[in-house]
A protein has these predicted regions:
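Glycine/small-residue-rich loop that forms an oxyanion/phosphate-binding "nest" at active or ligand-binding sites
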Residues: 84
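N-terminal accessory regions of nucleic-acid-interacting proteins
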Residues: 122-148
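Glycine/acidic-rich beta-strand-loop module
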Residues: 93-128
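Residue-level signal for inorganic ion chemistry
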Residues: 33, 114, 138
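Conserved small/polar residues in nucleotide/adenosyl-binding loops
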Residues: 155-158
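Short proline/glycine- and basic residue-enriched helix-capping loop/turn segments at helix->loop/beta transitions
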Residues: 88
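Anionic-ligand binding region
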Residues: 152
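S4-like RNA-binding module at protein N-termini
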Residues: 1-80
Length: 158
């Protein structure tokens, strides 16, 4: 039976990012088979019963969605100011899985965005240690001066 680190299992189940899962473990929110676990690196298998604050960890089937994010929508699962989020859009379309965006696009930006409940994939795509190259295409109105481009690193422009 395959064993994996508890924080990885939690991230893959969509509980939180790996780092946030580590914090939950250390702070005493996680039990494995009814026993409180506060040590990072604890290994679990698919047959272990994991709970976070008493809620069983559900190992969901991975789901992946591509959304053409419209302008005026927040790239987040929740917004404390009540603005519409990318997750709201998918829920309106019938998606019931606990999903979250991979990366972000600004409020006034449109573009394709990946949303998933696959924490392992999200981590591989977003964590700098994996060195995943990302390409952005920007369409601007008017001319861009050299002064406007100064904050952008020319070494990353093509």
């Amino acid at each position: 039976m395959k064993m994996e680190r508890l924080q990885k299992a939690m991230a893959e189940a969509g509980v939180a990012s790996r780092r946030a899962s580590e914090k939950l473990i250390v702070e005493g929110h996680v039990k494995v088979n009814g026993k409180l676990v506060t040590e990072l690196g604890t290994k679990v298998s698919s047959s272990d019963q994991v709970t976070v604050d008493g809620v069983p960890l559900e190992r969901e089937q991975p789901e992946y969605y591509l959304l053409n994010k419209p302008r005026g929508v927040i790239t987040s699962a929740h917004d404390e100011h009540g603005r519409k989020t990318v997750v709201d859009i998918l829920k309106e379309g019938g998606v019931t899985a606990r999903i979250y965006p991979v990366g972000r696009l600004d409020y006034d930006t449109t573009g394709v965005l990946l949303l998933t409940n696959d924490g392992a994939l999200a981590n591989k795509l977003m964590h700098p240690s994996f060195k995943i190259e990302k390409t952005y295409v920007a369409k601007v109105k008017g001319l861009i001066s050299n002064h406007d481009l100064e904050p952008v690193s020319y070494t990353h422009l093509r």
